[in-house]
A protein has these predicted regions:
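Subtilisin-like serine protease catalytic core
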Residues: 1-57, 71-76, 83-88, 102-107, ...
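Conserved small/polar residues in nucleotide/adenosyl-binding loops
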Residues: 322-324
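Short pre-catalytic strand/loop immediately N-terminal to key active-site residues, enriched for Gly-Thr
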Residues: 5-11, 190, 198-210
Length: 324
């Protein structure tokens, strides 16, 4: 409907299947390749034209997000970005921001791109959007790759050209072993784990990129949203709340003080996001997302804090249309 290729098959690189399995694969082929959120449901759009490998979209990204939202999707996984206009706030970025303003409980997540060698402000649009979560890639320590705990050198750097922090977070994106489409004719990576489809392709292949990092971050976003719904009791968590929770739980990789133009606010960490104190205790949660502020005004809150613990506060908001 929105892609260049009407076929549901992934006959070119297998990129889309690799992303989908990383997010929500059920591990039926090999438990080691279970996705981050294996009980999630999938709404998919074929944006890669398999006969040519060309990427493209038909219609507006606003309409695509609206279609997904109407089919109950609440996390939008976008392991792609536009060529050119790097670092710029484009019409597509504005379109995504407008949709999030209109439908505040869908969280769009975009890869920043793999242009780390080109210097600063190389983030692809729509990751330059203001109401999105823009994801860069971190190392994993997979054998033959750099040690875990750093931003990988191919991950595009921020900030946006108008000075905003990008990426927002990073996630593991090096040497990820995930699903390979049975019909893929030009697999983009080497096979991993064991087992083969009837047609000869391996079940799994290894890929690296901010696309792969976006899949991991999107799975974390889905589980974070589920936690807020089921454990905190907020039936329809806003995109801003999911973003705030993930940023608050992100781990500083230590390359520079956060936030910075390489890792944003740090590497996503599900445990620190939902159980930040000791990994076992569900905290009392206070959320106030109903008030708005005008220039020159403020809101005052008072909390009683255990002196033996610190206080972390993260503010995230969905920009109004006049600021988009």
């Amino acid at each position: 409907q929105f892609g260049l290729d009407p076929s549901p098959a992934d006959t070119n690189s297998g990129h889309g299947t690799h992303i989908a399995v990383s997010v929500l694969g059920n591990g039926s082929g090999d438990a080691a390749a279970t996705g981050v959120a294996p009980e999630a449901n999938l709404v998919m759009y074929a944006l890669e034209h398999d006969p040519t490998g060309t990427f493209g979209r038909i219609g507006s990204i606003y309409d695509m997000l609206r279609d997904a939202e109407q089919m109950t999707a609440r996390i939008s996984v976008n392991a792609w970005g536009l060529n050119g206009n790097y670092g710029q706030y484009t019409a597509d970025a504005r379109s995504v921001d407008t949709f999030v303003h209109d439908k505040k409980d869908l969280t769009p997540i975009f890869s920043v791109g793999d242009r780390g060698s080109f210097g600063a402000s190389q983030v692809s649009s729509p990751a330059t959007g203001k109401n999105v979560i823009a994801v860069g890639a971190s190392t994993t320590g997979v054998p033959g790759t750099p040690s875990a705990g750093a931003v990988v050198n191919f991950s595009s750097l921020g900030p946006s050209l108008d000075g905003r922090i990008k990426p927002d977070v990073v996630a593991p994106g090096v040497g990820l072993c995930s699903g390979l489409a049975e019909e893929a004719q030009s697999p983009a990576g080497a096979s991993c784990l064991s087992g083969n489809h009837a047609g000869g392709n391996a079940y799994y292949m290894t890929l690296s990129g901010t696309s792969q990092a976006t899949a991991i971050a999107s799975g974390v976003a889905g589980l974070t949203r589920e936690f807020i719904r089921e454990q905190v009791g907020i039936a329809a968590p806003s995109s801003a709340l999911v973003k705030a929770a993930m940023i608050n739980g992100a781990r500083d990789l230590g390359t520079a003080d956060i936030p910075n133009a390489a890792e944003g606010w740090g590497e996503v960490d599900l445990e620190r996001t939902v159980l930040p104190m000791d990994g076992t205790t569900v905290l009392d949660t206070f959320v106030d997302d109903k008030k708005s502020l005008s220039p020159g005004f403020g809101l005052l809150y008072s909390f009683s804090i255990d002196a033996s613990h610190g206080l972390d506060m993260t503010l995230a908001w969905t920009l109004s249309l006049i600021h988009i």
